[in-house]
């Protein structure tokens, strides 16, 4: 990261950037495959940190810990903040010298109105209902969803 006081960088792997091994790790549905998907996110984090800082997380014991609310942090590198998200075959990670949060959502089929009722404020619900097309509603809802998830992950509240 440079010498900037507040800096964060986002890294991601898309399906076309991943090896067959990565693809198997992130596209699974069983509990074990989901754990492997999570480990893939941490491998991306380790790759980022090794490239930018020459820290080798894989050689550090218990390198990633969690706060009481579940927010992950680097035990030996408290000056670095990170967050990981995965959805579908995508993995994203943000790394910075300030607290960070990130969320990505694959635009899968969902029950739009039912989901919107759960996550939208009254004003957001009004806007959602005014959107004219199904695609527009879906885009709006996923945008709201990812912003809220990112914020929760940034603050570490109720993760």
Task: Name each region found by the language model.
Residues 1-159:
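Core catalytic alpha/beta fold that binds nucleotide/phospho-ligands
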């Amino acid at each position: 990261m440079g010498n900037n006081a507040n800096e964060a960088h986002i890294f991601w792997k898309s399906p076309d950037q991943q090896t067959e091994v990565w693809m198997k790790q992130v596209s699974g549905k069983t509990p074990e495959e989901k754990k492997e998907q999570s480990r893939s996110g941490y491998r991306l984090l380790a790759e980022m940190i090794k490239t930018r800082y020459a820290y080798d997380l894989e050689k550090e014991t218990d390198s990633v810990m969690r706060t009481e609310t579940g927010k992950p942090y680097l035990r030996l590198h408290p000056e670095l903040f990170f967050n990981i998200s995965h959805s579908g075959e995508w993995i994203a990670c943000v790394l910075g010298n300030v607290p960070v949060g990130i969320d990505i959502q694959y635009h899968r089929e969902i029950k739009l109105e039912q989901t919107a009722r759960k996550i939208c404020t009254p004003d957001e619900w009004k806007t959602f209902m005014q959107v004219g097309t199904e695609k527009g509603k879906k885009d709006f809802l996923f945008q709201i969803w990812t912003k809220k998830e990112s914020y929760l992950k940034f603050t570490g509240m109720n993760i």
